[in-house]
């Protein structure tokens, strides 16, 4: 059975680009009589607001994109605990203690030398004593996933054959120093646990997909079919943003735009029709 998901973060109102992703996942699931899951990415307690959760549901209902069930990532922290413990036991999740300013300085030095700004894995060479001293001085560190530095390849549902050299990508941070789980880990764990078969999202996630494929395999999950669509931009060519409210769906609704017209445009946009 085809199982898809739409996973917005409740940090602002949905914009037209979000609608396009939601519509694609909804149609893909319903075409195959599958399941469409609304997954609220609310692992950030400071930025996530209930008013935005309610607004997301209202927008999807207005469009007629009815979900089969709702999941909240904030209620699934135990699963993320178990997954991170598993990755630690396999030696692919390691603690780092650099501050944001230190990491920024490293990136600038690499760029000045004509090198890609990739994390140098300095934390992997720390002795146990050095780790203990840093923890005493700075507190808990953040945790990174150790990528296998080979090419990650997959056949994308839209972009076809893709290949990313993992050596050109920094080991992704999965857990912040304050213990908060970041999107990359939560998304992978949920996709595995919910049996997601297809993921349709923006092309800005292509590099994320490469790292997530390695993480899914590291956790023993089955890699879903990925498809990355082109991104929409605002009137001035700027990227759409929930926080900035660019082309917010609520504004289009208030302007009298009808749901069928909007869905029809989003479904055909970028196609030969």
Q: Which residues does each predicted region cover?
A:
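N-terminal Rossmann-like or analogous alpha/beta NTP/dinucleotide-binding catalytic cores
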Residues: 1-113, 207-221
């Amino acid at each position: 059975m085809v199982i898809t998901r739409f996973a917005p973060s409740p940090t602002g109102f949905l914009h037209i680009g979000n609608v396009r992703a939601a519509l694609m996942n909804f149609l893909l699931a319903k075409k195959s009589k599958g399941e469409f899951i609304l997954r609220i990415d609310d692992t950030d307690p400071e930025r996530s607001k209930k008013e935005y959760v309610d607004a997301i549901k209202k927008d999807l209902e207005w469009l007629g994109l009815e979900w089969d069930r709702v999941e909240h990532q904030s209620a699934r922290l135990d699963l993320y605990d178990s997954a991170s413990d598993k990755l630690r036991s396999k030696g692919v999740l390691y603690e780092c203690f650099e501050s944001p300013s230190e990491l920024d300085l490293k990136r600038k030095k690499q760029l000045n030398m004509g090198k890609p700004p990739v994390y140098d894995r300095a934390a992997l060479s720390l002795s146990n004593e050095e780790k203990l001293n840093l923890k005493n001085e700075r507190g808990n560190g953040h945790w990174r996933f150790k990528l296998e530095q080979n090419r990650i390849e997959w056949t994308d549902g839209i972009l076809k054959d893709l290949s990313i050299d993992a050596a050109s990508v920094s080991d992704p941070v999965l857990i912040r120093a304050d213990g908060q789980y970041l999107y990359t880990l939560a998304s992978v764990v949920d996709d595995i646990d919910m049996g997601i078969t297809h993921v349709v999202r923006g092309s800005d996630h292509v590099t994320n997909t490469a790292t997530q494929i390695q993480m899914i395999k590291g956790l023993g999950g089955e890699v879903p079919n990925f498809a990355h669509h082109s991104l929409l931009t605002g009137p001035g060519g700027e990227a759409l943003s929930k926080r900035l409210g660019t082309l917010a769906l609520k504004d289009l609704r208030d302007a009298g735009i009808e749901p069928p017209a909007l869905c029809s445009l989003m479904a055909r946009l970028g196609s030969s029709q």
